[in-house]
Amino acid sequence: MNKPVEPNSFRTGPDEQGMFGIFGGRFVAETLMPLILELEEHWNAAKNDPAFKAELQQLGAHYTGRPSPLYFAERLTEHLGGAKVYFKREELNHTGSHKVNNCLGQILLAKRMGKTRIIAETGAGQHGVASATVAARFGLPCVVYMGATDVERQAPNVFRMRLLGAEVKPVTSGHGTLKDAMNEALRDWVTNVEDTYYLIGTAAGPHPYPELVRDFQSVIGQETKEQILAAEGRLPDMLVAAVGGGSNAIGLFHPFLDDKGVAMVGVEAGGKGLEGDEHCASLTAGSPGVLHGNRTYLLQDSDGQIKEGHSISAGLDYPGIGPEHSWLKEAGRVEYVPIMDHEALEAFQLLTRLEGIIPALEPSHALAEVIKRAPKMGKDQIIVMNLSGRGDKDIFAVAKHLKMDV
């Protein structure tokens, strides 16, 4: 296959139609189009408004706790015996993951648009918690759609959302996971267009969502760049991040995309293996199609029906991926690889015991890839991994797999 011509910059997308090459766009019902266009108009104004940026930065510093530290994992590095491993500690943010970066940005946008009701979808519950948190902070009612399967396996986060005043609506259609929750949220949005803002949790969906979520999450990569230069005097050799919908990964990668010496690896959920259907590796094992308003790589059958994926991690079991990742894969700029459930579980336990950090199962997938790569690299080389969430929410799932009592 001919390699596509490399663009002058990997950081200029999307175009005015919201396309990254052949991916992205806005494939939505006619009733939603005016809303999407209104959102785009407000987003274009907000991103060029110094007051908007200043308010977001102020909230980031005093509410979220930014900048998050860049931490040299000394004992893990020694254990692996190769490249130096650094973690971008997004799990130390308020609410315990990277999700709050995007939620604060979007709730400021919702306020700017005069919306008085927030809806969101959630898989692992981290985005639901972050949405409920910012809605409480700004005094807006919040409804969170969550697949019934996820409600069951993420009980602590469901309780948190309800404590924060959000209404959690379990979705029983389909397999009761993230895709179904997103479908339900889109239905709600169409019905309540006047007063409702849909706070999407990942860098997917119709344009301008992939762009605005990426921009709100890019604070991760911007800080990392400054921090690694301060720590090492140079850029890292490799960046590694888990990809579900892809927002933590694009947030880390985007500021580095034009730095040719920095390799990037996105880690997908390989589930129980790629042979069957029990995985969520849409870039490794999927094909392009349209879902939730954008064209991207999807897990689909020969008739274009969306398959239900599986991952031990509720945050990675989305059968699609943000369109910018699809484009970066085809452009050859980022490599995407799968990690199996059992590998993520092993990585989870290793980090807990070596560094005293309990990671979420999502970044445990990224860590499993770091564990494979670091020993093959020189001791003078540097890997930065996005530790995108903490593992409190996963202790019950992990205990079940390890056959331990909680």
UniProtKB/Swiss-Prot annotation:
Gene Ontology cellular component annotations, sorted alphabetically: cytoplasm
Record keywords, A-Z: Amino-acid biosynthesis, Aromatic amino acid biosynthesis, Lyase, Pyridoxal phosphate, Tryptophan biosynthesis
Cofactor(s) it depends on: pyridoxal 5'-phosphate
Keyword Amino-acid biosynthesis: yes
Entries under SUPFAM superfamilies matching the protein: Tryptophan synthase beta subunit-like PLP-dependent enzymes (SSF53686)
EC number: 4.2.1.20
Pathway recorded for this protein: Amino-acid biosynthesis; L-tryptophan biosynthesis; L-tryptophan from chorismate: step 5/5
Classification via HAMAP family: Trp_synth_beta
Protein name per Swiss-Prot or TrEMBL: Tryptophan synthase beta chain
Organism: Chelativorans sp. (strain BNC1)
